[in-house]
A protein has these predicted regions:
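Extracellular glycan-recognition regions
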Residues: 1-212
Length: 212
C-alpha cells in the first residue's frame, strides 16, 4: 500500500506561526469526542538542518496545539507546541520535546549510473524518523453554554505503548480548543520549511484512523 507524501513548503517572509501557513491539510472535527491516530515518517533535507524544517499533527483554530517533528542540530526532535491567538501573530511555544531515533535511507543510485562526462556529485544522505501520533479530543461541560473541546497529544514508537506529551510537571494537561475565525476547530497535518531552497524534505502519512 502507498502513503500520502507532503513535501515541505517554503513559508513566506514574515511567517509567524502555523496560522500563516497556506498548506495545512485539515478536516473538521467529526464529533465532540474522538481519537485520531496516525503512523507517520519524517524525512528532512539534511541541507536544511537547523533551518526549521518540520511536520506534524495539529489541532487548529484561533489557538492551536500540535505534535511537531523538527530537524535540529541535535537530530530530529518530537515537540509538543501551543500557540494562543495564532491568527494575531503570537509566537509558538515549545512546551515539551523528546529525541526521535532516525535511520539512514538507502542511497538512491550508485556510481555505475553516473554520467562519465560530468564531474561526480556525492548523493545527499537522508535519514528518516518514524512515529505514531495520537490526538484525543473530549468535551468539557460549561454551565449555560455548549461544551468546549479539550485535547491531549500522545506519542508511541511502536503503536502499543503510549506517552502523553505535555508541559513538564503537568501530567494530564489538556489543551482547550478554540474555533477558527470563520469555522470550527480542525485537525490534520502540515509540512513546512523556513529556508528558501529548491529541494525539500517530506512527511509520509502511512495511515490515519479516527475512532470514538
Amino acid at each position: 500500500m502507498g502513503a500520502l507524501r507532503l513535501y515541505s513548503v517554503d513559508q513566506a517572509e514574515g511567517w509567524r506561526n502555523l496560522g500563516d501557513s497556506p498548506n495545512l491539510l485539515l478536516q473538521k472535527t467529526p464529533a465532540d469526542s474522538f481519537t485520531a491516530t496516525a503512523k507517520v515518517r519524517f524525512v528532512p533535507n539534511p541541507q536544511l538542518k537547523e533551518k526549521g524544517e518540520s511536520c506534524g499533527l495539529v489541532l487548529m483554530g484561533q489557538d492551536y496545539a500540535a505534535l511537531k517533528m523538527t530537524d535540529t542540530k541535535d537530530g530530529i526532535m518530537l515537540q509538543y507546541v501551543e500557540c494562543g491567538n495564532a491568527l494575531k501573530g503570537s509566537e509558538e511555544s515549545v512546551l515539551c520535546e523528546i529525541p526521535l531515533t532516525s535511520e539512514p535511507l538507502p542511497t538512491p543510485y550508485s556510481n555505475k549510473y553516473m554520467s562519465t562526462s560530468v564531474p561526480p556529485v556525492a548523493p545527499v544522505s537522508y535519514e528518516a524518523a518514524e512515529a505514531y501520533l495520537r490526538l484525543r479530543v473530549m468535551p468539557r461541560e460549561r454551565k449555560g453554554d455548549v461544551p468546549e473541546l479539550t485535547a491531549t497529544f500522545w506519542y508511541s514508537p511502536d503503536g502499543k505503548k503510549w506517552t502523553q506529551l505535555a508541559p513538564s510537571g503537568r501530567s494530564g494537561h489538556a489543551f482547550t480548543a478554540r474555533p477558527g475565525k470563520w469555522i470550527g476547530a480542525k485537525f490534520g497535518f502540515f509540512c513546512n520549511r523556513l529556508a528558501s531552497k529548491n529541494d525539500s524534505g517530506w512527511m509520509e502519512i502511512d495511515w490515519i484512523k479516527v475512532t470514538d
